[in-house]
Structures are given as C-alpha cells and as structure tokens.
C-alpha cells in the first residue's frame, strides 16, 4: 500500500474541466491528484517562417509553473531567463501532440498550446499532455469554420503517465513524495492505440533490468488506457475517433 492508500497500479484521481476560461478556443483544467494544470489552445492565423507558402500548419507549446505552484516559491520564467526544465517539457508537449496531427489539414495556421501549472505534486508534464489533448480537440471543434472535421485532422489520441521503481516495487503515476525517492523514473507518452510517442527514463543512483523495464512499460500501458478512457468520457460527443 502506498503512502496515499493507492494500489501500485492505481492512478491518482483524474478529472478534466472543459471550457474553464472563455477567450481561448480550447481551455481545460486538469487535475491528477493534487497536481493541477490549466491547458489552453489558441488559434493563430499565421505560421513560422519556415512554413510560409507551404500550405501546412503547425502546433507549438509553452509550459510554465506559476510561482505559487510549489513551496518554496518558484521564480517566474521571464524572457531570456526560461528554466531549462520548462523548455524541455514544452518541447515534449509539442512533439507529443504533433505526432497525431495531420498538419497539412490545418492550412497555414498555428495552434498554440499553453500549459500553466497551478499546483505541482509530481507528474506535471504528464498532466499537461493529458489536458492539452482535450484542449486541442475542443479548439478544433469550436473553430470548425477554419478547419476540416476533427476526425480528418487528428488521427489518434495522446495520453501520458509516469511509472517508477521505489523499494523494488513498480508504481504507476508517482506523486512528488514518491518521485523524489524513486530509484527509477519513466515518463511514457502513447497513443490510445498503444503506439509509443516518447519514453523518457533514467535510474537515480540505481540501475534496472530489461525485465523491470518491460514490466514498467506494461504498467504504464494500463495507465494510458485508463487515462484515454477518462479523456473520451470528458469529451463525450466531441471525441474525434471512431
């Protein structure tokens, strides 16, 4: 039994609150346990210079932790002084969502994903990806005058979860207390169809075997399936896949 009473293979409580703010085309507040992230998707009618004249669109992401999301306070990211971790995570979010997008179907438009962490208790990057996918679908749906039907633009779903080894036990969806003590920590990004988008993993003063890696990947897949089901429930009739 884990310190919060969960089973080793149990996710933290997960909830998506859609249309959380009005200005963006898509806006979702996602909670995974105490970790809370506001994910928005905005449409810009231009593309980066390298895509001008190609007829192809783009998706990019920004990620930040608000100063009060942690204790002690985290200094705010500023232009010219962006946390290297934030840069890594926002690139991960962008790559993850582009993996299931038909960018040619967007026309010369950019989808901006913004993920702001309101409270951090481990797994902020995975929560951000999970919420960003829901915000993306809402943005495409609410901007139907600009884009083809969502099912033609999006070819799969995206979900992310952490897994780790703590005391030689495989755990799903680590919170901060578990993450800081874990001997091995992996972040998985997968499609709902079970295809890998990204695997990030490392030992923390420890090594792990191929059989342990295989078990962690299997455990992560169980988590991805459960998260995908929650995304489907949250989107309801807006779910883009057959």
Task: Describe each PLM feature range.
Residues 1-242:
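Polyanion-binding surfaces on beta-sheet-dominated domains and ring/shell assemblies
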């Amino acid at each position: 039994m884990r310190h919060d009473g969960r089973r080793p293979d149990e996710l933290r409580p997960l909830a998506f609150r859609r249309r959380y703010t009005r200005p963006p085309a898509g806006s979702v507040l996602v909670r995974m346990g105490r970790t809370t992230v506001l994910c928005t998707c905005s449409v810009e009618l231009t593309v980066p210079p390298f895509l001008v004249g190609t007829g192809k669109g783009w998706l990019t992401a920004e990620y930040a932790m608000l100063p009060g999301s942690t204790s002690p306070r985290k200094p705010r990211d500023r232009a010219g002084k962006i946390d290297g971790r934030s840069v890594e995570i926002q690139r991960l979010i962008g790559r993850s969502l582009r993996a299931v997008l038909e960018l040619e179907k967007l026309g010369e438009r950019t989808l901006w994903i913004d993920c702001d962490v309101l409270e951090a208790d481990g797994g902020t990057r995975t929560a951000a990806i999970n919420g960003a996918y829901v915000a993306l679908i809402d943005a495409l749906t609410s901007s139907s005058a600009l884009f083809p039907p969502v099912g033609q633009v999006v070819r799969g779903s995206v979900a992310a979860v952490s897994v780790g080894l703590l005391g030689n036990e495989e755990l799903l969806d680590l919170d901060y207390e578990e993450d800081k003590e874990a001997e091995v920590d992996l972040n998985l990004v997968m499609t709902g169809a079970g295809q890998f988008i990204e695997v990030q993993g490392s030992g923390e003063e420890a090594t792990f075997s191929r059989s342990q890696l295989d078990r962690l990947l299997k455990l992560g897949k169980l988590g991805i399936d459960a998260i995908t089901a929650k995304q489907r429930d949250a989107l309801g009739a807006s779910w883009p896949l057959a």
